[in-house]
Amino acid sequence: MPGLLQNKELEGAGIVWLETLRRKGREAFAAAGLPTPKTEAWKYTRLRMLGADDFVLPAEDEIRCSCGCEEGHCEHENCSCRQERPFPAYVLGFRNGFFRPPHPELPEGVEVMTLMEALQLEDEAKSRLGKLIELEKYPLAALNTAYLQEGLFINIRRGVRLDKPILIENCTHSGGQNLFFNLRHLIVVENGAEAEIIETYAYHGEPKSRYFSNIVSEIYVGRNAVLRHYKLQDEAFKACHVALAAVQVKEGGRYRRFCAQKGADVGRDEVVVSLREAQASARVDAVYKMSGWATLDTTTDIRHLSAHTCSEQLVKGVVDGDAKGVFQGRIHIAPDAQQTEGRQLHRALLLSDRAEVDVKPELEIFADDVKCSHGAASGELDEEQLFYMRSRGIDAEEARRMLVEAFLDDALLQIENENVRNWLKGKI
């Protein structure tokens, strides 16, 4: 595993409990190593570049904006640092894995600080960090923990309802280096609060850049709280993007997630949701669209740990060229989780006879009064629909585009915020 376990002095080196947590992460990753096809949870997704290339941890003093210019001295008119967002948002930015100030002016009752600031100031952050992640089960989360430093602590206080989303923009400019960076986010939505959080991952500069972004988020949704969580993964086509979100939802809480993946050579978005108390619910939807030789993996694990909980999943993918789509979806119903509902559906559209989709739906049911279902299917574009559209004067390429858009539409319609929905639709 060249270049992944390195000696690096990290902030907070004198904090005993933090050093202990980092050491546990380092030991867990050293024991497990990189996941391979023999690892059940990774049997369809190969981390090709991670086992072959050397990687460099980025230097913080290389302060760059998204196009590679020095921060505050950008001369590129089309750079994202000069672009207006398509919807109002509180914007937070990361460049090459490092937070770039300033903080936006936030309403009362909303705390946002870097993770290291929070771990030195906030007992809330210290008491929650690392509690939702099983390091032995998730080796790349263990690797992330070994380098635990960069990331955000977001706390939405009791009863606060945000008037616009928090947008976390992540931009990579590798400058020809094989960069490797880890981000760790801790998000708390307290009882009765409501928020939207959007994450974007993109590159600027050379599209053939090789880099590895390893993201872990721990998310707490309180009683009767609501979190709508959106993500766009549009990394460079030779990058590797691996993300794990571990979510805990309390009584009456609602967690809504939508992930759109279209970039990276290997991209994996994994979410683990624990519905811990009655009336907790989760809706986890995703779309992926790719071509070339890419592999895009969507993995979900919904754990119904209490009675009267509900979950729904809808995942749709479009695969072209020699690319491969992966969906692994697990619904676990604990013995005491009676009168629970869990639904899961995956559909894929294959645009090439070389395209591949691997699907592994799972139901683990240990209660008898439940309503659960799962389904999966893949197919090609309807030739009759194509013929009909061609006969109406629509050229073949436009007809294909329209049919693909229509195929993905019912997944995108699950996004409640119309501005975000239209923006993501334009990106996909």
Regions found by a protein language model. Give the residues of each.
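Short, low-to-moderate order helix/coil transition modules at the start of elongated helical scaffolds
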Residues: 1-216, 226
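Conserved beta-strand/loop scaffold segments within soluble protein domains that form the structured core
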Residues: 119-394, 408, 412-428
